[in-house]
Amino acid sequence: MIYRSKETVCSITVPRDPEYLALVQDILEHPLVRSMEAYTQHGETSCLRHSINVSYLSYLYCRDHGWQARAAARAGLLHDLFLYDWHFHAKETGNYFHGLTHPRRALENAQRLFSLTDREKNIILRHMWPLTPIPPKSVEGFVLLYADKFCGTAEVAGRIKHLLGPVLRPRQSV
C-alpha cells in the first residue's frame, strides 16, 4: 500500500488517514509530544518524525492483520517520549545506558500525560528487546519493535546515502 497524502502538524508531515488520526490526534496535539521535534533521533530525523514513522507503520500492519491497531498507533507515538537529546545525555548525566533506560523514562512520561492500556504500557516498556531482557507480551509489541528497527535503519541509511551520494554516483566517462 502506498500512502502519499499528508498534512502538516507542528512542521511535521503526518499521514492524512482519518482512521489513524482519530486514534492519535490527542497525542499529536500535546505540547510535550510536539516538543520531540527539537530532539534528533537518527541521522537528521527528529524524535517526533521517527515516532510518527514507527506509529503509522505499526498501525497499518496491525490494522491489516486484524490486531489491535489502536494500541500500536498510540504506543508508537509514545515509545520514545524520553524528552532529551540522547546524543548528549551521557555527557550531561553520566547515564551511558540510554538504550536500556529510555523505555522506562518514555513510559513514565506517557503515563503522566495520557491514560494508557496495559497493552500500550507493555509495548512502550518492551520495545527495545532484545537489548532489554524481557520481550513484549503482545503481537502488537513485536510489530512495533520491528517497525522501530526498520524505521531507525531507514532513517540512518538515508543520512548515509545523502553523505555518500557524491562517492556513490557512477563516474561519467570522458
Language model regions located:
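Metal-dependent phosphohydrolase cores
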Residues: 1-174
